[in-house]
């Protein structure tokens, strides 16, 4: 079951709802998840999107996604799917944040450079 909220400006509500619903139906059909997608300008942060777990982190089911609001439809779709894949990784327990550290399959990768992070490689 999916509980989806979205907010922001300069984005297609229909596209957002369609992508998130498709993803959850395909990859997380037996999980209850709550996802809020906030569309905003992220150029200052030099990112197109990011996702995180809303605490508590134990059995995460509530997520926030921030996504840049000025992208082409194809770039928007690719970015949102990338961030949703991180949601999947957290729900399945592959990616965990504990005690200020980030674990991938039980191994601490807190000091791993972005381009070498296994969860980012998998999400691409």
Residue ranges and their predicted role:
Residues 2-59, 63, 73:
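Auxiliary, metal-adjacent structural segments of Zn-dependent hydrolase domains
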Residues 78-90, 123:
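Active-site recognition of the HExxH zinc-binding catalytic motif
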Residues 3-7, 67-71, 107-114:
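Short coil/turn segments at secondary-structure junctions
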Residues 74, 90-121:
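Post-HEXXH active-site segment of zinc metalloproteases
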Residues 62-80:
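Short pre-active-site segment immediately N-terminal to the catalytic Zn-binding motif
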Residues 59-62, 89-93:
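Glycine-rich loops and low-complexity Gly/Arg-rich segments
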């Amino acid at each position: 079951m999916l509980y989806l909220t979205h907010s922001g400006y300069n984005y297609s509500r229909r596209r957002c709802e369609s992508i998130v619903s498709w993803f959850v139906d395909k990859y997380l059909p037996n999980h209850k998840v709550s996802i809020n997608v906030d569309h905003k300008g992220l150029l200052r942060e030099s990112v197109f999107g990011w996702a995180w777990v809303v605490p508590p982190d134990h059995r995460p089911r509530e997520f926030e996604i921030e996504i840049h609001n000025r992208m082409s439809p194809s770039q928007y779709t690719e970015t949102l799917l990338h961030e949703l894949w991180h949601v999947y990784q957290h729900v399945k327990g592959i990616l965990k944040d504990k005690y200020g550290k980030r674990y991938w399959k039980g191994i601490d990768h807190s000091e791993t450079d972005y381009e070498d992070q296994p969860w980012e490689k998998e999400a691409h």
